[in-house]
Amino acid sequence: MSIEQLARKTVRELTPYQSARRLGGSGDIWLNANESPFANEYSVTCGRLNRYSECQPADLIQAYADYAGIDSKQVLTSRGADEGIELLIRTFCEPNQDSILYCPPTYGMYAISAETFDIKTKTVPLTPEWQLDLPSIQNNLDGVKLVFVCSPNNPTGNVMNRRDIEKLLDMTTDKALVVIDEAYIDFCLETSTVDLLAKYPHLVILRTLSKAFALAGLRCGFTLANTDVINLLLKVIAPYPVPVPVADIAVQALSVAGRARTKFQVLDISANRAYLQAGLGMLSGVTVYDGYGNYLLVKFTHADALFTALWNHGIILRRSPIENCIRISVGNRDECEKTLAFIRAHVTSQGNSSQDSASKSNSSANNDELNASN
C-alpha cells in the first residue's frame, strides 16, 4: 500500500487552499495577500524560551479584551483566525453528520477546514448585491451547526447589512452558532457586531492581528464569544497554541501606543484605497466595487490578460473567483501609484486596439459594400 493510499480518502481528494504565498510569483510589488505595507518594529526578549508558553497568556487575553470592549472570559487566542475556524468545527460538528453553511463568494478556508474533518458543507450564494439571502439560508438550516459570515467580506469588500445579521441570529437561536469573520473589521470598527454578544449567546466573532495590525507573519488570532462557547473551545485547543515571542509582540501591538499607531496606519491605508478607487474608476470598462477593508475588488473587460501582464511586470495581484475580477490589496502610496499607472496604460492600450480593430472592420465592410454595388 502506497503512502498516498494510507491517507484518509477525504485528504486524498482535498484541494488545498490556494493562498497567495502558495501561488507564488516574483516581483517588487506584492498586492495579493491583503497584507499591511507597514513593517513595524518590536522588542523581543529570549529569557523565557526554555519554558512552555501559557495556553492562554493572561496579558494578551486582557489586552485584546480591552481593545474589543468585552470581558476577558469572552476571548480565546489562537494561531491566527484560521485556527479559530478549525476549533469551532472540531468542537461543534460531528463528522459525516453535521454541516456548516457559508455564502460564496467568500473566504475559502471555511469549506476546506470542514472537508478536512469530514464535515458536510452547504452553500447559499450571496445576493447580486452581495448581501445575505436570508430566506434561502433559513431553508437550508437543517443539520447545520455553524453559519459562517465574512464581514467585511473577502473578496468582495462589502459589509453585511447589520439588520440581516440580527435576523440571521434570530432564526438560528437554539439551532446553530453564527460565526462572523471580522478579519478586516479594524478598517471599519463602526460596523462590528461585538456589541451583539450581550444579546445572542450563539454569536461567535473571529478577529486577527494579520491585517490592520500589520502582523500577518506573527499568526495571532482571536475568537470572541460567550463563556459557554469559550470553555468548550478550551477543551479542544492545543496546550501551547501561542509562542512566547508571539504573545509578547501582540501585547505590544495592543498597547495604547500600539493601537494609536495602528489607527494612524489604517487612516493611511484608507486614503490609499480611496486614491486607487478614484483612479481606477475613471478608466473605461472598469468597475470598482466599494471596499471597507484593505483591498478592492475590480472588474475589467479583459481581466486575465491584465493579470498576466501585471504578473510579468512584477506586480502581483490576486485573481478572484468572480468572473473578470481582480482583487487588489492596498499597499503604500508608491505601490498604488505604480500599479494604477500600469493598469491605466494597459487598459488604454487595450481600448485603442479595440478601436483600431473596429475601424478596420468598418472600413472592410464599407469596401465590401462598394465592391458589391460596383
From Swiss-Prot:
GO terms for biological process: L-histidine biosynthetic process. Residues 351-374 are annotated as: Disordered. Homodimer. Residues 351-368 have a biased composition (Low complexity). Belongs to the class-II pyridoxal-phosphate-dependent aminotransferase family. Histidinol-phosphate aminotransferase subfamily. Pfam families: Aminotran_1_2. Its cofactor is pyridoxal 5'-phosphate. Its EC number is 2.6.1.9. Keywords: Amino-acid biosynthesis, Aminotransferase, Histidine biosynthesis, Pyridoxal phosphate, Transferase. Gene3D superfamilies: Aspartate Aminotransferase, domain 1, Type I PLP-dependent aspartate aminotransferase-like (Major domain). Pathway: Amino-acid biosynthesis; L-histidine biosynthesis; L-histidine from 5-phospho-alpha-D-ribose 1-diphosphate: step 7/9. The modification N6-(pyridoxal phosphate)lysine is found at K211. The keyword Amino-acid biosynthesis applies. GO terms for molecular function: histidinol-phosphate transaminase activity; pyridoxal phosphate binding. It catalyses: L-histidinol phosphate + 2-oxoglutarate = 3-(imidazol-4-yl)-2-oxopropyl phosphate + L-glutamate. It is an enzyme of class 2 (transferase). The keyword tRNA processing does not apply. InterPro entries: Aminotrans_II_pyridoxalP_BS, Aminotransferase_I/II_large, HisP_aminotrans, PyrdxlP-dep_Trfase, PyrdxlP-dep_Trfase_major, PyrdxlP-dep_Trfase_small. This is Histidinol-phosphate aminotransferase.
